[in-house]
């Protein structure tokens, strides 16, 4: 039975574990600042010299977006809404296949540093600038959320000053990211994934022991309606269903893994294309492992608190504080383990923030500085990259203040990626899949998708969906012992949300329809609008007349399974030709270099003749 004030507090050993995690992360950054001669060029700093291998990159990919938002938000999601969130296991598999077979081949073939370099090659400088600005806005906002999340956990379980913890998070992360570049980020991610799994495991194992085995946990979850894996309701207004998670989640996470600089920068830093693809598929195993840990933690939390919900009882002020509360409650007799869990949440944030800062520095240097200051030496560009990392670290710390105003961390984080990531995904899809889409169509499509997704996203924040669409599960106070309270809390209740939802009379008609769209469909909506509008605008503005460089498009050879399937069916002399999907080869086309593993060239340094031919994606 849970009673107020009955949880433990941080001990010396907890602080030791926590400090050790920070120290090791910082040491890794210092090591890679000097290892191998240090970060002599911007390519060394931003891309690790394009010499990374699959396993560390895979773990880094897993850690980058399995942040404190996952550590704190997903168990609370399962506790309140049930285990339907586990359907994301299917979504992750679909996303990895799309990313590795559609987007990775094109980006790797071009040997680019910033994904937005592709937009200039395929379209023009203005499209590249638009994509870069949207990415910077998206990433700074998201990073603010994931900095705030562990600070909230620390504040809840240790009494640390909330904003002091926010600053500490940003400073430590910015330090090792600035010192060691991409290699430091990747290898600290490897270490931090281990900490995340260890932290989750300590909570799960102890919960199983406390509850007498995994059986009682599953039994409590079943009778509490938490094992609600399947709900095929097609209603797009319902917060989570099979379709919102699989369809909406696929668009949201493809925007992250397929075209987001933070992820793409890692796998195109691999030394071969095979290693790059392998890193994505190994990363899938990591995603499944972290998801399983988070879901099991949520079910264990419900089993322990099924008769006395700490949130409704006001032992915690927000659902995202439930996991740190649980860790102190059940691990208080084991010095060091509460510190391990807080380190788990903190590790998730350090990995995500460092990835974001490194990506922000990359797009700023490659897209906003290098094209206009080409006379700068590589040494100077390396120092500029480090300075840019410092600046973005400070900006992200400042933006963490907004996170305190955005409600649930998990939904807020995915909503941001939906509102901005969806239109960006549509933009890259227009360039890679549709050879007739021109620059005008790309701009109109991007802005249309962004306007629509921003409209519904902001509307949903102002007028949150009602409980009828979010479908929270009942929580109980029957087992609480409120000896200091006059009221007798002995009934099953739903947490009150009236302070978050305006009165029905003040809600416009769109509030219960358009603004109540599942947050996972924000990305789907933005992508579809961007693609449809972009295609129509291009057709109306003469897009069919252009002849696009085939290196910028998806080809049949880019599908690895097609290469194996048809390898024995090619006629002699055809091996060097490239068949572009949905594209008729013209007599003026010539065979283009298909790129090699570990591309070392920089297209911005190509000869002026080649540059004119490839600029805007049109062959002169």
Swiss-Prot record:
Keywords: Cell membrane, Glycoprotein, Ion transport, Membrane, Sodium, Sodium transport, Symport, Transmembrane, Transmembrane helix, Transport. It is found in: Apical cell membrane. One of its GO terms (molecular function) is monocarboxylate:sodium symporter activity. It is a multi-pass membrane protein. GO terms for biological process: acetate transport; chloride transport; iodide transport; lactate transport; nicotinate transport; nitrate transmembrane transport; propanoate transmembrane transport; pyruvate transport. It holds the Pfam family SSF. This is Sodium-coupled monocarboxylate transporter 1. It comes from Xenopus tropicalis (Western clawed frog).
